[in-house]
Regions:
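Surface-exposed interaction/gating patches
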Residues: 53-101, 105
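Long amphipathic all-alpha helical oligomerization modules
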Residues: 84-137
Length: 137
């Protein structure tokens, strides 16, 4: 019974973890830092204190992959904004990162039987990548 309870708990956390991956990855790109692995470090306030401490969360494979795919969608908005601000250099760098992310996710999911909704999300990400390419001309 313990194994099934853990699987149900994982299903509950996947959406939250996915949002964390998307946000942390987007922030990393915008601040020109490295996109984190499944183990994400962050700072948090110690309860009952003003002091901060570093902590980590390790997200599931599913959450990581879906979060990266969602990040690709957000990066198109970054490209659009950068282009409007005439920062074509950054827009092109972000486009390169989008392509790398897509290729990485494609490699991670090529032989996966567990990622149920991956095909539609991959199609959306491919379309987003294509739209960003057109945007950059």
């Amino acid at each position: 019974a313990g194994k099934y309870r853990k699987r149900d708990l994982n299903r509950l956390f996947v959406d939250s973890e996915q949002e964390i991956v998307e946000a942390v990855s987007l922030f990393a790109v915008i601040t020109r830092k490295r996109i984190p692995s499944r183990e994400i470090s962050f700072r948090t306030q110690i309860p009952g204190s003003y002091d901060m401490k570093y902590d980590k969360i390790k997200v599931s494979d599913d959450a990581y992959v879906y979060g990266l795919l969602d990040c690709i969608g957000e990066l198109q908005a970054v490209i659009s904004r950068s282009k409007r601000q005439n920062d074509l250099d950054f827009a092109n760098k972000v486009f390169g990162i989008m392509g790398e992310l897509f290729n990485e996710v494609e490699t991670l999911t090529e032989f996966s039987n567990t990622l149920k909704k991956i095909k539609p999300k991959m199609d959306v990400a491919a379309g987003t990548l294509n739209n960003a390419r057109k945007l950059l001309g």
